[in-house]
């Protein structure tokens, strides 16, 4: 439990988190306990801020500024200082003061995991025995790092040690759970037949119901992949051909049952179910899948008390609303003149139209999207293409559009509303509307070859 007070109000020693964010354009810093915001402070003219806290027990928090989130482990009477340059936040952030050691160790491990991502991808093509040798070697290095850290910091609390060990080793455990999904043997032998007997021995070292760690990203990401792998193994056990399980309803139904069998209650269970629901919605070709209502009904059976129930019920309703033949939902936009309009007002009922999305804040990917649109325009000259910017900088969007030959451009003024109604999880999404103003497809990736098949069938 955390109570935010002024330290001067009581004769007691305070816990302090202060910081300096050079070049920050965000006036505030928000402190979260788990997913709940508990306090907000404002940067002064010199870009300094301070949280004065009274806490009774150690807890993992995170703070947010300008869309950047960072974990911070705080113990009673800590006096932490965090530094970062807003221009390169992730690369420049560091801690000092009492309590800094564990927080800097977590930062180092997160940075190492990012750098090792390409290495893990190379390892995924190795046969199981060689793959395990590589991971075992990395595990020993990580364990040595952890033990050296504990040795030079003998006063670490048990919670701090747990965080250090998980931040160092769980990214490796997650990779072990991913491996069966991506490895393909030359003779297509099911992977569960050729894995070393001790391949999953690391699972014996894991506490699968650690409430202290349930919001810690390395721990949570491992749990997601653990559930995925259990479902993958069970679903493909008697199958002798490779299948893309992300497109299989049976795989997603297995996840529902597995989560229930392993986690009886709590936030971890609820969050894993939330992840499973979005994985189903965004990975399966749901508009072609007549069984989506079956999934929703089975999901609801296990999630009557889920803390995310209202959110997920709304998402499921939106999935149903986006089915082919329905009229698309309405949302607010502005045109290139800065005038407010609505999605319903810009539709042209006389022509098939693709609405594509891009972001002035994701320029590299947006350029690829515009190249794809140019290609589609050449292939389908009778189709209209309308771009909607979902970035956060209206001024930059307007400036960029005015300096290009892009036509039929609009800007979303409420991305949260738009993303919930259209179910946007990345900007590759497209929305295809027919000549009668009804949905043809609301779940097709703009780069998907299937999009061209859809247009060919409508234009033929």
Could you say what each language-model-derived stretch is?
Residues 1-16, 442, 459-460:
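Bacterial Sec-dependent N-terminal signal peptides
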Residues 7-163, 175-176:
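A non-transmembrane, solvent-exposed segment enriched in polar/low-complexity residues
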Residues 166-236:
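Extended amphipathic alpha-helical segments with heptad-repeat/coiled-coil character used for oligomerization
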Residues 209-285, 294, 311:
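Long, charge-rich alpha-helical interaction segments
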Residues 308-344, 412:
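N-terminal "domain-start" segment that seeds a small globular fold
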Residues 341-373, 384-388:
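Short active-site neighborhood of thiol/selenol oxidoreductases, capturing the structured segment around
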Residues 400-435:
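Short, internal strand/loop/helix patches
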Residues 432-460:
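Thiol-/selenol-based redox modules, centered on thioredoxin-like
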């Amino acid at each position: 439990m955390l109570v935010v007070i002024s330290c001067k109000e009581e004769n007691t020693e305070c816990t302090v988190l202060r910081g300096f964010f050079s070049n920050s354009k965000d006036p505030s810093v928000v402190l979260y306990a788990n997913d709940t915001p508990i306090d907000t402070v404002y940067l002064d003219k010199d870009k300094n801020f301070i949280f004065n806290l009274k806490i009774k027990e150690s807890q993992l928090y995170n703070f947010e500024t300008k869309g950047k989130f960072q974990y911070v482990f705080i113990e009673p009477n800590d006096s932490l200082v965090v530094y970062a340059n807003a221009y390169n936040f992730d690369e420049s952030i560091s801690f000092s003061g009492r309590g800094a050691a564990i927080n800097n160790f977590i930062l180092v491990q997160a940075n190492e995991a990012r750098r090792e991502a390409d290495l893990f991808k190379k390892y995924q093509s190795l046969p199981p025995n060689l793959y395990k040798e590589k991971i075992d070697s990395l595990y020993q290095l990580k364990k040595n790092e952890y033990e050296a850290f504990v040795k030079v910091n003998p006063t670490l609390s048990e919670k701090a040690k747990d965080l250090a060990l998980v931040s160092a080793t769980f990214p490796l455990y997650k990779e072990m759970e991913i491996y069966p999904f991506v490895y393909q043997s030359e003779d297509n032998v099911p992977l569960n037949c050729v894995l070393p007997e001790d391949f999953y021995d690391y699972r014996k070292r894991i506490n699968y119901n650690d409430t202290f760690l349930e919001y810690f990203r390395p721990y949570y990401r491992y749990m997601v992949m653990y559930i995925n792998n259990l479902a993958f193994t069970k679903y493909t056990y008697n199958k002798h051909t490779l299948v893309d399980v992300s497109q299989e309803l049976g795989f997603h139904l297995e996840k529902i049952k597995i989560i229930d069998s392993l986690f009886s209650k709590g936030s971890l269970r609820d969050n894993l179910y939330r992840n499973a629901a979005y994985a189903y919605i965004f990975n399966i070709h749901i508009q072609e899948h007549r069984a989506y209502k079956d999934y929703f009904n089975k999901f609801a059976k296990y999630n009557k008390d889920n803390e995310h129930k209202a959110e997920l019920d709304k998402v499921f309703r939106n999935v149903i609303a986006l089915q082919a033949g329905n009229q698309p939902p309405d949302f607010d936009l502005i045109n290139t003149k800065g005038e407010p309009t609505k999605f319903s007002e810009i539709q042209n009922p006389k022509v098939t139209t693709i609405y594509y999305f891009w972001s002035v804040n994701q320029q590299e990917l947006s350029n690829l999207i515009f190249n794809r649109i140019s290609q589609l325009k050449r292939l389908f000259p009778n189709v209209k293409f309308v771009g909607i910017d979902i970035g956060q900088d209206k001024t930059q969007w307007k400036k960029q559009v005015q300096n290009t030959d892009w036509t039929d451009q609009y800007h979303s003024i409420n991305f949260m509303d738009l993303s919930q109604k259209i179910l946007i999880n990345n900007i590759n999404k497209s929305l295809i509307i027919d000549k009668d103003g009804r949905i043809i497809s609301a779940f097709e990736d703009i780069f998907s070859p299937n999009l061209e098949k859809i247009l060919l069938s409508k234009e033929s």
